[in-house]
């Protein structure tokens, strides 16, 4: 029994970390990170579900919204203040909030996240 446990642990240790941990959904990212400010409007963050505030942001589009969330904007820190999130998870969180505010955005792809990261890295926090 002990040797089976050792083999199992050794096998798990050899897997990439991304295989061991499932990525969060947009709703999970919102609940665990974004809701701290976006549920109450802390620091003038647009409140989840506020179609008037989010409507303006939705019109800007994901090519502006996601890079801003990745690099940080105004009082919002980069990655929503949680550097353990992946770029794809941040994008999912943004899309979850934008869709609750009237957007109709689809699930992002890894290619989308890579493109948005490149744009975020090219810009500065504003």
Q: Where do the language-model regions lie?
A:
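Sequence context surrounding c-type heme c attachment/ligation sites in exported
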Residues: 23-35, 55-66, 84, 106-107
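The canonical Cys-X-X-Cys-His
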Residues: 31-40, 93, 97
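Gly/Gly-Pro-rich "capping" loops immediately C-terminal to redox-active cysteine motifs
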Residues: 39-68, 77-80
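Flexible coil segments in periplasmic/lumen-exposed cytochrome c-class electron-transfer proteins
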Residues: 80-126
């Amino acid at each position: 029994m002990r040797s089976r446990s050792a083999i199992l642990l050794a096998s798990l240790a050899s897997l990439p970390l991304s295989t061991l941990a499932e990525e969060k959904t947009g709703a999970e990212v919102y609940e665990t990170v974004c809701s701290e400010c976006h549920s109450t409007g802390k620091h003038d963050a647009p409140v989840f579900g506020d179609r008037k505030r989010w409507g303006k942001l939705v019109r800007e589009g994901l090519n502006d919204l996601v890079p801003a969330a990745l690099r940080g904007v105004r009082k919002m820190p980069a990655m929503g203040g949680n550097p353990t999130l992946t770029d794809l998870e941040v994008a999912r969180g943004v899309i979850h909030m934008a869709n609750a505010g009237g957007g109709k955005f689809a699930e992002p792809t890894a290619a989308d996240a890579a493109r948005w990261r490149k744009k975020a890295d090219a810009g500065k926090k504003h």
